[in-house]
Amino acid sequence: MARTVETVDGGNWREFIASPRAVLMIGKSDCPACGAWTEELNGFLGSDAKWTDVRFGKMVLDKGGLIEFKRANAWLADVEELPFNVLYERGERAKSWPGGGVERLVSRLENA
């Protein structure tokens, strides 16, 4: 079964980032670049065999229910460009970067 980007929201974000390795894409519903990155990432996950140990999720900031996430992650207030990606390793932020692109993602996974 092909993998796809998981939906991360106020009810599951703690469990998601606590995974051994997880990439969280943060966006908004009215962000064309966020939608394009989601499509590109889903295409990548559909054929990827190397990064099966990594969870990939998307959080949509304007969907509501994210007060706890926002309070626990004060750095979010400084994010100026969406989409914004965060690589978590066992609940800790290991890397973060703005924008999309599978090549950039793979580079960060390989160098984490």
Annotate each predicted stretch with a short phrase.
Residues 9-12, 42-43, 70-73:
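A generic local structural motif
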Residues 24-27, 59:
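Conserved beta-strand segments of the P-loop GTPase G domain that flank and frequently precede/overlap
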Residues 31-34, 85:
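The canonical Cys-X-X-Cys-His
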Residues 35-50:
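Typically the conserved alpha-helix immediately C-terminal to a functionally engaged Cys/Sec
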Residues 50, 54-112:
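Thioredoxin-like thiol-disulfide oxidoreductase module
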